[in-house]
Amino acid sequence: MKEGIHPKYNEITVKCLCGNSFESRSTKAEISTEVCSQCHPFYTGKQKLMDTAGRVERFRKRYNIAAAPTEES
């Protein structure tokens, strides 16, 4: 490698919003992340439910669309 053209590569602590932290290497001084392997649903097996029903209702209200009739058996 050429001398003097590469950024300094430091050992840093990466901090997650869940409180977890781990060591890594980067050219940045510090890194903070919103999701890590300790809190991501894929790794934890816990699913976070999103409020999609509220979004659908807002869409229908905005465009004045009546709800589809439900099929009863």
Swiss-Prot record:
An individual GO BP term: translation
Positions bound to Zn(2+): C16, C18, C36, C39
UniProt cross-references to InterPro entries, sorted A to Z: Ribosomal_bL28/bL31-like_sf, Ribosomal_bL31, Ribosomal_bL31_A, Ribosomal_bL31_sf
Transmembrane annotation, as ranges: none
GO molecular function terms listed in the Swiss-Prot or TrEMBL record: metal ion binding; rRNA binding; structural constituent of ribosome
Cofactor notes: Binds 1 zinc ion per subunit.
Subunit structure, as described in the record: Part of the 50S ribosomal subunit.
Protein family per UniProt: Belongs to the bacterial ribosomal protein bL31 family. Type A subfamily.
Name assigned to this protein: Large ribosomal subunit protein bL31
